[in-house]
């Protein structure tokens, strides 16, 4: 009986936004994995930050503010007036900060919040996501409370991302507001990136996707590419 052939993973392509991708690449390379970044989402500032300024005046109305990512933290606090930043970091704003994972928690602490102001998934959670966060915060919410979810918007200005956590909160009587703090837009792939993508579609490279947006932004500029031999991991 002949042995089943194995396909060696030549490399991993990380498709997260540039700053996030570089962190993932460094972590993978530290484990001996050949990893490269091919960002398929570009993070950009809002064209109109006025909605964020209005929300900043109302932070005390919220029992918690959930940040979907480190990018949400960075762009929210970059546009948050200094007085509101100081009030929150000094504990004069009672809103809890919710984080889906360690990267977002680090960003919150770098923004000035203390660890005791932040709720995040348990350290031994099998996955860092909204489900793991909800397992830790579900018991602290009460009907009638308000929770703000800070996330990104797409190129049309529509909120992007999963609505799972908002659905759980609404189901238990919590009022949810969404706030876009940044835009997620499709990058323009240059010829080098297109060549690498075409090569990775057939050479055993493992694509690492963390959103359906990234997949769309890969396929759209390469309409004639055959992806049937491509290999990928999706984080959710």
Question: Where is each model-derived feature located?
Answer:
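Conserved beta-alpha
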Residues: 1-235
């Amino acid at each position: 009986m002949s042995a089943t052939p194995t396909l060696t993973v030549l490399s991993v392509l990380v498709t997260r936004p540039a700053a996030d991708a570089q962190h993932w690449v460094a972590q993978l390379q530290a484990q001996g994995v050949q990893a490269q970044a091919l960002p398929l989402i570009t993070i950009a500032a809002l064209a109109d930050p006025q909605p964020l300024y209005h929300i900043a005046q109302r932070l005390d109305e919220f029992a918690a503010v959930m940040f979907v990512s480190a990018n949400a933290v960075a762009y929210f606090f970059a546009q948050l007036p200094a007085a509101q930043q100081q009030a929150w970091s000094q504990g004069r704003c009672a809103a809890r900060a919710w984080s889906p994972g360690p990267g977002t928690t680090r960003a919150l602490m770098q923004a000035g919040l203390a660890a005791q102001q932040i709720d995040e998934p348990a350290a031994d959670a099998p996955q860092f996501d909204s489900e793991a966060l909800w397992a830790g915060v579900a018991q602290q919410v009460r009907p009638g409370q308000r929770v703000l979810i800070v996330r990104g918007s797409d190129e049309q200005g529509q909120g992007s991302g999963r609505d799972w956590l908002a659905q759980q909160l609404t189901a238990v009587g919590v009022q949810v507001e969404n706030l876009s703090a940044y835009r997620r837009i499709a990058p323009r792939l240059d010829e080098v990136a297109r060549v690498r993508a075409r090569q990775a579609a057939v050479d055993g490279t493992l694509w690492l996707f963390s959103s359906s947006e990234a997949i769309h932004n890969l396929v759209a500029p390469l309409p004639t590419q055959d992806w049937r031999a491509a290999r990928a991991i999706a984080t959710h």
